[in-house]
Amino acid sequence: MLGLFKKKMAPDGPVDFTTEMQIEASPLKVYSHLDWSSEDHTYRALGEHVETIDSARGFYRMHVAAMPGHQFDFAVTEAEPGERYGYVSETRPIIGRLIDMQSRYELVALDDGTSCLVKSHGTARFVDGLTQHQLDEEMSRMSLACHNSLAKLKIHAEYGIEAVRNATMASVQRVRVES
């Protein structure tokens, strides 16, 4: 009876996330928005500071203006232009309970290469010792983040960076009004 109200602990270990989205742009164009070394990378195009730490080894660091005091480190794990791109990311200091995230994008050409299906797979590692409720919260946030990442990629590839900027601003303003 005493254990009935005890918090249920979540299993430790990585959590996988998978999502996909069709984008009306060529796989090479979409790839350029994913590639940290490209000036067309979505965050570079949005004006965020992306620093090349070691281009030969694929190490990059991003500083987001809206998050002073945080750095986002990226280590490219695979890069096949127009086909796949992968990296491991870490945020310092840690935000929430996420330790790191392994991201992999597969680009499948459709319609004679004028569009593509983007398959996104992520493996997140969270701090150990989470309750099931805490892990469920983190999984919800990560699922939303994965979807939003693909949505930004789609908007950037199909409508340009200004459309991403406008969509982001509209979202921020909506949150302010609703709060």
Region annotations inferred by a language model:
Residues 52, 67-68, 94-98:
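Short glycine/serine/proline-enriched coil/turn segments at secondary-structure junctions
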